[in-house]
């Protein structure tokens, strides 16, 4: 009799667990409640992009970055790693995106020079050294027929390594958009 009681008890628990799991899935899948687009915390909101906000970033800065992420498929990029830095050529087939790209790049290079970290929530930790040692970077920026050309050099080997790393990160974002950010953050054990 006790073996039969145990078997019924185990089957009952199994059925309860199954229904509990199915119920949890259904509830968290409903629009507005779970892992869906606009859910309550278990999602990535790629419409409003709250991860683009920063403690020291204006709404305009965040909106400009959103333009780049929302239109990443119009952006192409070439990177040459130099022994003392990088040379990049970045372009967009969309004139409005190209304007945002140029403005963002020039503004960020200026902010690095001033040590003015925007502290964007999804910002790569690679940028930390730039804001700490911005005076160790020499930047030359031009807009040419081939695109936005950025040459950045440094005598500081740590800064050069960070320039190489960040150039690769930006290229990944130009290739994959926000997916690249999610992959980088997951690899670093970070969330936003």
Predicted feature residues:
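N-terminal secretory signal peptides that target proteins for export/translocation
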Residues: 1-5
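N-terminal export leaders
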Residues: 6-11, 15
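Extracellular/periplasmic low-complexity linear segments
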Residues: 26-72, 77-81, 87, 102-137, ...
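Terminal, regulation- and interaction-focused segments at domain boundaries
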Residues: 80-96, 147, 151
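Hydrophobic alpha-helical segments of integral membrane proteins
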Residues: 16-27
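A short, solvent-exposed beta-edge/loop patch
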Residues: 138-161, 168
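Primarily extracytoplasmic ectodomains and periplasmic/lumenal surface modules that are beta-strand-rich
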Residues: 85-86, 94-99, 107-110, 156-160
């Amino acid at each position: 009799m006790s073996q039969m009681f145990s078997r019924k008890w185990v089957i009952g628990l199994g059925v309860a667990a199954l229904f509990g799991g199915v119920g949890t899935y259904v509830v968290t899948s409903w629009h507005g409640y779970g892992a869906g687009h606009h859910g309550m915390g278990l999602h990535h909101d790629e419409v409003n992009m709250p991860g683009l906000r920063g403690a020291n970033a204006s709404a305009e800065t965040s909106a400009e970055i959103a333009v780049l992420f929302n239109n990443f498929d119009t952006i192409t990029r070439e990177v040459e790693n130099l022994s003392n830095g990088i040379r990049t050529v970045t372009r967009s087939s969309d004139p409005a995106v190209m304007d945002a790209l140029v403005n963002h790049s020039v503004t960020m290079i200026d902010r690095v020079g001033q040590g003015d970290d925007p502290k964007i929530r999804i910002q790569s930790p690679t940028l930390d050294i730039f804001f700490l040692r911005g005076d160790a970077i020499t930047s030359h920026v031009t807009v040419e027929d081939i695109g936005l050309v950025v040459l950045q050099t440094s005598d500081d080997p740590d800064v050069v390594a960070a320039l190489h790393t960040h150039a690769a990160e930006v290229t990944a974002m130009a290739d994959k958009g926000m997916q690249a950010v999610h992959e980088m953050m997951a690899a670093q054990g970070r969330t936003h």
